[in-house]
Amino acid sequence: MNKSLNYLRHKNFAIYGLGVTGRSVIRYFDKNGMKNYVLWDDNKKVFKRFLGSKYRRMKSDFLESINFVDYIIVSPGININKTKLKKVLFKNKHKIITDLDLFYLLKPYLKSIVVTGTNGKSTTCKIIEHVLKKNHFKVNIGGNIGSPILNLNSKKNSLIVIEASSFQLAYSKFVKPDYALILNITKDHQDWHGSMNKYIESKFKIFSLQKKNNFAFINSKKLLKRFKKNKYASKLKFVAAEDYKKIKNKIENNYLNSESNQENMSFVYALSKILKIKEKPFIKSLKSFKGLNHRHEIFYKKNNKIFVNDSKATRFEASKFALKNNKNILWIV
């Protein structure tokens, strides 16, 4: 029997937010006999789907229960400082966790890689997954990419690759990755976090939760200074672009050799060395990587013209990486 699951069956939960994440939590609870929960969503149309069913919970029930529950699972993107339930949530802030926390509470035995940063998270996660699978690791991928984390059917010897947003990390308390990567930090989500400093703090939260035998990866001297100042327990791995450049010409993959992927690849290479993947099998595994849809995706070529779909880049900072890689550009926004 899963001792962690049995322990959590006797805890009381409040689920706030019934989007993809909230619904994945409900499914997991129902599947595993976890019946002690109330739920709510500010969006009446979303919440209405649960009325008249076994999930029926009124707002009054939610507000009355929230002071007595053990954990409040908040969906990513919900800012407790701006919600209608601000007062009661702030009072119970110490109880707030995310679906990532729940995953770690349920499966503390799993090894994990958490990738965060402003740009390149999804691509980096997929490259890591690809390299690990090609080198005979048992891998699952989830979080902000692919399936919600609680949907994963992870075996005891699996290595989990998780894409984590600043929203998730801001609330996290039990996420303890063996390997944590902060790819980059540029201005983003300040409307949610309140300031650039708080945004950076949310990213660095991942290092504060690590143990002394875990690894932390960064590539910026500015972030390095912050890491040393905070004296985190984990082992620091500074990602130097020069290390990857030494093998770049051996990699036969135009997608990965693009300027926009150099930072991502530097992290993947640094991680592969810590995981003791040798250089030759590492290079060989990258040959078959095809890239992600809508991320610097070449979908048509004609008369020396190349058509690139980069529609996943919804911010200028993200688009800038793709634009740097090309000349004579007609940029359609």
Report the location of each language-model feature.
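Short, basic phosphate-binding NTP loop
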Residues: 1-114, 295-297
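Residue-level detector of alpha-helix initiation sites
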Residues: 20, 119-123, 262, 313
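Beta-strand->loop->alpha-helix junctions that form or flank phosphate-binding loops
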Residues: 38-41, 99-102, 233-246, 283-287, ...
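Short internal beta-strands
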Residues: 36-42, 216-220, 332-333
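Residues in the short beta-alpha loop(s) of Rossmann-like NAD(P)-binding domains
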Residues: 19, 42-43, 145, 220-222
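Nucleotide phosphate-binding/pyrophosphate-handling subdomain across enzymes
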Residues: 2-12, 24-28, 32, 138, ...
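Phosphate-binding loop of NTP-binding sites
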Residues: 27-30, 63-67, 76-216, 224-233, ...
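Active-site regions of enzymes building and remodeling cell-envelope glycoconjugates
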Residues: 50-61, 93-96, 110, 157-158, ...
